[in-house]
Amino acid sequence: MSTDWKRSIKLLRNNLRKQGLPVYWHKNSPHTYEVWQHGIMLVFYRRYCDSYTEFVEWLPNTKLPEYIGLKAIPDEGTLCKEEKRLRPFLEAVAFLLVLPLLPKHFVAGADMTGLQTKRRSAYYIKRILGDYSRRGFARLEFLVWKKYILGWEMRLLHKDELAMLKSLWKKVKKKPSTLVYDKKGDCEDFHEWLEEQGIRSIAPVRKGARRGRIRRKLMRNFPQKTYNKRNRNENVNYVFKNRYGDSLSAYSLKGRRAEIATKIVAYNLWARLSALLHELFNIAGNATHF
């Protein structure tokens, strides 16, 4: 556990430094905490706790303050405020954690999932108030390679999946050579948009389809083996929601975007640590055979 924590702290601190993160936000502040310490605490909070209060109570009983040189335990309001401030830096770190692992050519998949924004039970609302409460959902589009999240886009109001993908596409630092999508991606304009960028587009064609040069090519010879890699999206959606929750605790849009960014940093960080652990086990296993 301590080794994983030290590795994760080192990775996070190095990537935060690459973003030009200042040591302190203000010259005249008390200088109790350095900015990078808040970033690391927020990632650990999203990994191990469900609320700021729980994290503040959990933190003194761990080795984390010693590992990051913490002078005092921050309060809940400070952590909440810092998460919103650090959002652009954390969004960049989420991709920098994966960037060194990406090959020159790779297959990525995109898919949309939903996160609940209201935790009230419709049953009890009906029972007490006599009226049903409309459930709120945030739409979250993921771009995935293997078990890593390369990009994401969140919307609280309805927006088309392909339009969301085009929005997040601008923020992706390294584009895939092939993109797989479900039947929602069966659109000739969408295929042509990717082809203009030199990217191969794969999506199952709907029954009765006749039009479209790229769609007809997919009907004649559909690359099923490559398309099966889209199952990784379902795995990532399940693992992410199972580990970090299927709902958003923040109430404002700014807070929700910051919450998603921190959770994705934590997800990519521990996915990379687990991959490193498997690699070390394989090296040790191969060494025993010689």
Regions found by a protein language model. Give the residues of each.
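DNA-binding alpha-helical recognition surfaces that contact promoter or target DNA
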Residues: T53, E57, K81, Y238
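Polybasic low-complexity intrinsically disordered regions
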Residues: S29-W36, V43-R47, C80-K84, P88-E196, ...
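Basic, amphipathic alpha-helical segments enriched in Lys/Arg and hydrophobic/aromatic residues
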Residues: P223-F290
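Basic, short loop/linker segments at the boundary and entry of helix-turn-helix/winged-helix-like folds
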Residues: S2-R47
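Helix-centered, glycine/charged polyanion-binding patches within enzymatic domains
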Residues: T178, K183-S249
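Short hydrophobic "helix-edge" motifs at membrane interfaces and signal-peptide entry regions
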Residues: P65-E66, L101-L102, V172, P223-K225
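DNA-recognition alpha helix
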Residues: Y52-I68
